[in-house]
Amino acid sequence: MSKLGVLLTICLLLFPLTALPMDGDQSVDRPAERMQDDISSEQHPLFNQKRRCCRWPCPRKIDGEYCGCCLG
């Protein structure tokens, strides 16, 4: 049992729980920063000014979702 305690202590010293991302660290909780990082449709490099849209199908996804330009 003491070996298990030593192993647990070593693991907690090497990987403290504070190093793990918590729910409060997610970008969802910081909308102001999200808005600064967000690119509007008109400024998107694939946005066609004449057609007012991107070419379809969407050439790329951001975090598994379509870019804002393609969603219109």
UniProtKB/Swiss-Prot annotation:
Q: Which positions carry Leucine amide? A: L71
Cite the entry's keywords alphabetically. Answer: Amidation, Cleavage on pair of basic residues, Disulfide bond, Neurotoxin, Secreted, Signal, Toxin
Read off the InterPro entries from this record.
Conotoxin (IPR004214)
One cellular-component annotation, GO: extracellular region
Entry's localization field: Secreted
Tell me where the signal peptide lies: 1-19
Pro-sequence residue ranges:
20-49
GO-annotated molecular function = ion channel inhibitor activity; toxin activity
Tissues of expression: Expressed by the venom duct.
The disulfide bridges present are C53-C69, C54-C67, C58-C70
Q: What is its main location?
A: secreted
As for what it does, the entry says: Shows a paralytic effect in fish.
**Family under the similarity heading:** Belongs to the conotoxin M superfamily.
What domain comment accompanies this record?
A: The cysteine framework is III (CC-C-C-CC). Classified in the M-1 branch, since 1 residue stands between the fourth and the fifth cysteine residues.
Further information in the entry reads:
Found in injectable (milked) (IV) venom.
Please give the name of this protein: Conotoxin CnIIID
- Organism classification, top ranks? Eukaryota, Metazoa, Spiralia, Lophotrochozoa, Mollusca
